[in-house]
């Protein structure tokens, strides 16, 4: 009997990521309005605290929620996660005008719990769904990454439009979307899951043993470094550098989107990037699903360096030398195409490792949230300091360093896997 399509879950994931991207925009606009009309001075430090509250909650709870999904079944978490998100955006509508920060911090903690419940459950579910089909696994994980990146990009656009049209009631629109996402999770087909019944101490011992396995232990620094690149290039830092009025004849990208229609031009550039990145993910999903995971990840590091060379050339092309873009832009696209293979390959690799601990699949896949969160915090923090010292070049320098660290660990892992395969082949 053929299995039902996993499309409802991927659609639900896309909607959740739309809400994630839109909520960041709408919340920022809401806080700006709150400062203007309520007379309460909300600073950049306060906004940073809200982000820290969300990430700290998600990072600390994701493994625990993944372990619970192993014991109780993933469907509960797939459905309850979006419902908690619905509650979170609804509560924002009731933010007090006097001293709103403690209330908003609590609301962000609720958002972190929602994400911690949902992401490990989705990845554990997809690993269960593709347990006996490696080629399907690569395709499904690529589609998950496409739903994630595409949803966030669409959400950023939707957030601004929703705020302009509906004001505070944009949060009500987000609540409706959370409800639709929960319905999609309900429609996701049932899949075979090995339910964990042992006590938490035994689970903890197994988890620590899994973490210390060379396949995963060597891989962790590489993935954190690549996730840090997302914190550098897919955060407000790059928007700030491109949009801030700044004239530097030696770095033409600094302030290149400032001035009239700068926001529109920036949206077109970022939108074009996300569209191309999504098309690259589709390619990796349907045409190269039989390429070894580690080889794809090594190819992605090559792509990072190609993109860095292109960005350096664009940034230092010199005034009036726009003709050189004919060389640098295609090179940049080649780099983006190659580097886009890392995320789906890494997710498929992590799912492969989970086959060795099928009972703890949700707990293990919860590492995705930890890697992504730690990496983004690292990229945002270091990116700000590098950009302060060296401008746009600083982001390129940091990217080169992080990619080099990732390359070292991937080569170590590649060598170990090759040796293990040789031993297996010799022993039969």
Model features per residue range: what roles?
Residues 83-98, 303-321:
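C-terminal ends and interior cores of transmembrane alpha-helices
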Residues 1-3, 191-221, 254, 427-428:
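Juxtamembrane intracellular "pre-TM" segments in multi-pass secondary transporters
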Residues 60-73, 163, 279-293, 387:
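Helix-to-loop junctions at the C-terminal end of transmembrane segments
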Residues 54-63, 152-153, 274-282, 373-377:
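Residue-level signature of mid-helix packing/kink "hotspots" within the transmembrane helices
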Residues 107-148:
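Cytoplasmic helix-loop-helix junction between adjacent transmembrane helices
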Residues 2-55, 217-222, 226-252:
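Helix-loop boundary and gating motifs at the non-cytosolic
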């Amino acid at each position: 009997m053929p299995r039902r399509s996993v499309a409802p879950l991927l659609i639900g994931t896309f909607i959740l990521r739309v809400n994630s991207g839109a909520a960041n925009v709408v919340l920022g606009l809401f806080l700006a309005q709150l400062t203007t009309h309520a007379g309460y001075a909300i600073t950049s430090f306060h906004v940073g605290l809200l982000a820290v509250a969300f990430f700290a909650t998600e990072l600390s709870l994701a493994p625990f929620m993944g372990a619970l999904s192993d014991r109780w079944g993933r469907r509960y978490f797939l459905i309850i996660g979006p419902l908690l998100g619905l509650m979170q955006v609804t509560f924002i509508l009731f933010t007090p005008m006097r001293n709103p920060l403690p209330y908003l911090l609590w609301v962000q903690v609720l958002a972190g719990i929602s994400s911690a419940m949902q992401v490990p459950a989705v990845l554990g579910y997809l690993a269960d769904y593709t347990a006996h089909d490696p080629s399907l696994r690569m395709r499904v994980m690529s589609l998950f990454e496409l739903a994630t990146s595409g949803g966030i990009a669409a959400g950023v656009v939707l957030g601004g439009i929703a705020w302009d049209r509906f004001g505070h009631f944009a949060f009500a629109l987000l609540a409706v979307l959370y409800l639709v996402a929960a319905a999609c999770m309900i429609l996701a087909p049932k899949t075979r899951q090995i339910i964990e019944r042992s006590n938490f101490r035994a689970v903890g011992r197994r988890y620590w043993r899994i973490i210390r396995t060379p396949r995963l232990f060597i891989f962790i620094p590489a993935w954190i470094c690549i996730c840090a690149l997302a914190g550098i290039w897919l955060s407000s830092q790059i928007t700030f550098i491109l949009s801030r009025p700044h004239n530097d004849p030696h770095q033409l990208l600094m302030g290149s989107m400032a001035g009239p229609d700068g926001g529109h031009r920036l949206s077109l550039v970022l939108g074009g990037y996300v569209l191309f990145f999504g098309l690259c993910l589709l390619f990796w999903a349907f045409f190269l699903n039989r390429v070894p995971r580690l080889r794809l990840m090594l190819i992605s590091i090559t792509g990072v360096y190609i993109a860095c060379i292109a960005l350096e050339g664009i940034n230092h092309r010199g005034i009036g030398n726009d003709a050189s873009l004919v060389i640098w832009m295609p090179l940049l696209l080649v780099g983006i195409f190659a580097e886009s293979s890392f995320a789906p390959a890494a997710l498929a690799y992590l799912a492969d490792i989970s086959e060795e601990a099928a009972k703890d699949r949700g707990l293990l896949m919860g590492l995705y949230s930890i890697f992504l969160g730690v990496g983004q915090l690292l990229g945002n923090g270091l990116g700000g300091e590098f950009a302060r010292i060296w401008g746009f070049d600083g982001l390129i320098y940091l990217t080169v360093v992080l990619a080099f660290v990732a390359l070292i660990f991937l080569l170590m892992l590649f060598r170990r896997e090759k040796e293990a395969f040789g031993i297996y082949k010799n022993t039969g």
